[in-house]
Regions:
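Carbohydrate-interacting/catalytic domains
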Residues: 4, 8-151
């Protein structure tokens, strides 16, 4: 907003003409779609079984990862969030299973204001311990990036 928020004023819709605002709108739209289309985002919201930290202790690099689970852990989501301006070219994240992890949302896409660098969509976990998990995979984590994987 260009001016202070006021309940009586209309929203500054004209700002959507600026690329940064349009990109943020697209990102929020994608997050809302993720929420509505994946039960792991809401099905077990009232239970700790629906949420699991992968790494909540990487404060030095300001990178955090966690999982959201659906009932029966049939469809799960893995989130990796980088809160720094530094890219991590080979960031390794621990995972619970030796499966394929599909990248379904990437904040580094150009439409969200990212670099637009093309990344592969499928990552295969290997038997390499990381984050206290028996398996892991490496991912090129962009600055201020959020990646969401489905498994």
């Amino acid at each position: 907003r260009q001016r202070q928020m006021c309940i009586r004023d209309r929203l500054d819709w004209f700002l959507l003409a600026e690329p940064e605002h349009q990109q943020m709108k697209e990102w929020v739209k994608a997050l809302l779609h993720l929420y509505k289309s994946h039960k792991a985002m809401y099905e077990m919201d009232q239970s700790w079984e629906g949420f699991e930290w992968i790494n909540a202790d990487d404060g030095y690099r300001s990178i955090y990862s966690f999982m959201r689970h659906s009932k029966g852990a049939k469809k799960n989501l893995l989130f990796v969030c980088n809160f720094t301006p530094m890219a991590r070219d080979d960031y390794r994240v621990g995972v619970p299973r030796k499966k394929q992890y599909k990248l379904i949302l990437n904040s580094d896409e150009e439409k969200y204001g990212g670099t637009g660098e093309v990344r592969k969509k499928i990552y295969k976990a290997e038997a390499k311990e990381c984050d206290g998990r028996p398996y892991s995979f490496a991912y090129k984590l962009p600055p201020y990036g959020v990646a969401v994987f489905e498994f």
